[in-house]
């Protein structure tokens, strides 16, 4: 998508002159820009119902799903998935291609509405405003390739009324402070991924959702991203990392959930020395490989 200086000034001037319109679209912009997602529809789901369960430590869980289901034209893509994501951890959502991982993440970020089941965020039923506290990078980051890293972030902070000081903060977190006037279109794939994460961090999220962030990266890019993800829990950010690259996941995550055939076949702490590959294959064989 091409965006030049005139386009930016036109948008920003129009928003400044029409404060009523700014108020009306601000919530929608947050849903799109904070999460780093461009949605195909302007419709966002409303509040999702939540069923309480006894015996769970709610203070320790930032996100829970209960019997989450998604049906596409009569075929169950996600079937009664109940996740428990601990605060300030890195949670690996694993599964073969087509297992249902991306469908689950799209329900967590409001892109898809669950057919049934419930989602709870930070101790309350998930609602649209919670997207202000959730950052996400799903698929390729939405970048203006003819703008610099700083300018890409400036577009978002201006539209959303955020302090520009946050731009340098997130650029420092993702180690993109020295890119100067280099345009995003000239960035390596790893740099683009990190800029996408910077966009998702602008709202200081409590939860960061990353869908296959290392896809296509070279070994150096993977190592840089690994160290970045490892640093987030110390900053008070919980990470849900979706991936099928087991060797990489094993070096990053604290807990794992393994999806196969749309079913959660395993969830638990990843202990030192545990054979994740064998566990993964056992779950996949037991539950099948079909899914979305």
Predicted regions, residues:
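Helix-to-loop junction immediately C-terminal to a conserved catalytic motif
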Residues: 109
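Conserved ABC ATPase "signature" region
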Residues: 65, 154, 158, 164-179
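Catalytic Walker B motif of ABC-type/P-loop ATPase nucleotide-binding domains
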Residues: 208-212
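Helical segment within the ABC ATPase nucleotide-binding domain
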Residues: 222-235
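Conserved ABC transporter NBD signature motif
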Residues: 117-132, 266-268
């Amino acid at each position: 998508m091409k965006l030049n200086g005139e386009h930016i000034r036109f948008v920003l001037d129009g928003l400044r002159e029409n404060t009523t319109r700014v108020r009306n679209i601000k919530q929608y912009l947050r849903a799109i820009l904070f999460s780093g997602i461009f949605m195909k529809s302007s419709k966002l789901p409303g509040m999702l119902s939540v069923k309480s369960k006894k015996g769970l430590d709610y203070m320790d869980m930032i996100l829970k799903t209960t019997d989450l289901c998604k049906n596409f034209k009569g075929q169950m893509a996600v079937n009664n998935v109940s996740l428990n994501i601990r605060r300030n951890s890195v949670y690996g959502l694993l599964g073969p291609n087509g297992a249902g991982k991306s469908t689950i993440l799209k329900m967590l970020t409001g892109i898809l509405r669950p057919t049934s089941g419930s989602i709870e965020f930070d101790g309350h039923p998930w609602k649209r405003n919670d997207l202000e506290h959730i950052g996400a990078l799903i698929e390729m980051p939405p970048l203006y390739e003819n703008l610099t890293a700083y300018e890409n972030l400036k577009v978002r902070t201006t539209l959303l009324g955020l302090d520009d000081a946050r731009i340098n903060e997130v650029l420092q977190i993702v180690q993109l402070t020295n890119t100067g006037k280099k345009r995003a279109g000239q960035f390596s794939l790893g740099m683009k991924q990190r800029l996408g994460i910077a966009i998702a961090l602008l709202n200081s999220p409590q939860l960061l959702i990353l869908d296959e962030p290392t896809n296509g990266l070279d070994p150096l890019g993977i190592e840089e991203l690994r160290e970045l993800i490892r640093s987030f829990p110390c900053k008070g950010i919980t990470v849900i990392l979706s991936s099928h690259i087991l060797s990489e996941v094993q070096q990053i995550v604290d807990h794992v959930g393994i999806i196969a055939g749309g079913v959660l076949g395993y969830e638990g702490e990843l202990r030192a020395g545990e054979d994740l590959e064998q566990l993964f294959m056992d779950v996949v064989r037991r539950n099948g490989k079909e899914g979305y």
